Regions:
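Mature catalytic domains of secreted/periplasmic carbohydrate-active enzymes
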Residues: 1-323
Length: 323
């Protein structure tokens, strides 16, 4: 899964409707397209995350200024204009299209903002045909814009797959009545029991963006989650009918550090032995399955291939539950 844009409003593909994009600036490459090609070369499904909607609210502070100190009253970047870019690396671009125009704090997104969101997200779908589209929002974002892009995404999937739905739409805070329409996402969240419909959980081995101080902390895995913690989260996801996304933040050049790699190596070592307990498996029928087996010594497990939590020699062992 690749980040298509974040709250900063910068598109990581060759966007036709937004000049602030990675093909025109920075790495001068279609980053989303690069990830899509790499994933599909390995036979993997590919997803994108879209976070643009919150730019309307979250970047309004860019139009302010310090209230005290030596730079009191000096406007932040949100006040920059296209004319001020002459001779700069961003010459010809309007910063107002990146940070967003200044507006009252309680103002709702206007028609032009919503249409721009729709046009850009539709372009993303058209160019890269993601199997999964993730919105960092409660339900579909920006009213009619989100509803229409959701419909377009689903209809595009039907068209590409001979009338079969083969795509997933992820959003947050989904009420029960809509769980058949979209897959609920829980950011760094868990549920107490098994969900009726498939859902998604996500976490990060550190912060959502790269923080060097996590890398520099002492210990085998620095300030990152260790493989054991990640694997426990993964097991909990599978047993409760959910998928699991693990974010590994990259440095500015796109690489990951050796400590992050060590975390992934630890997960890989466990998966090489126990992957059959994760892939193509069914959710449990009892959420506290381990406790049930311990308490019911005369009972018979639903399946004879379950995951038990036992740590040994730095690898979480998978053992068949046989009676």
């Amino acid at each position: 899964m690749a980040l298509a844009n974040h709250h900063c409003n910068f598109d990581a593909w060759d966007s036709k409707h937004h000049p602030w994009n990675s093909a025109a600036l920075g790495p001068h490459r279609d980053v989303v397209g690069t990830w899509a090609a790499a994933a599909r070369k390995q036979g993997l499904r590919f997803g994108v995350t879209v976070h643009q909607a919150r730019n309307w609210w979250w970047f309004q502070p860019s139009h302010g200024a310090d209230k005290s100190g030596p730079l009191a009253g000096v406007p932040y970047d949100g006040a920059l204009t296209e004319a001020q870019g002459k001779g700069q690396w961003w010459q010809g671009l309007d910063p107002q299209r990146l940070d967003g125009a200044k507006h009252p704090g309680d103002a709702l997104p206007d028609v032009s903002y919503v249409k721009n969101f729709y046009d850009r997200t539709r372009d993303l779908i058209d160019q890269h045909n993601p199997d999964l589209l993730y919105f960092d929002d409660s339900l579909l974002p920006l009213g009619w814009g989100g509803m229409n892009i959701g419909a377009y995404f689903y209809n595009n999937s039907l068209k590409r797959n001979g009338g079969q739905m083969d795509s997933v739409l992820n959003v947050k805070d989904v009420p029960d009545r809509l769980l058949k329409a979209v897959a609920a996402d829980y950011e760094r969240g868990l549920t107490a029991g098994i969900m009726k419909y498939p859902w998604q959980s996500e976490t990060c081995i550190g912060a959502w963006h790269y923080l060097r101080n996590l890398y520099e902390r002492p210990g085998e895995y620095g300030g990152y989650q260790n493989p054991r913690e990640v694997i426990h989260w993964l097991i909990d996801a599978v047993r409760k009918n959910r998928t699991f996304i693990l974010n590994v933040p990259g440095r500015p050049d796109g690489t990951i550090d050796e400590t992050e790699l060590a975390v992934l190596d630890g997960i890989t070592s466990w998966m090489e032995i126990n992957g059959e307990a994760i892939y193509e498996t069914r959710p449990w029928k009892i959420s506290s399955y381990i406790e049930e087996l311990r308490d019911n010594t005369t009972g018979t497990p639903e399946a004879n291939d379950s995951v038990f939590y036992r740590w040994k020699q730095s690898i979480l062992e998978h053992r068949a539950a046989k009676r």
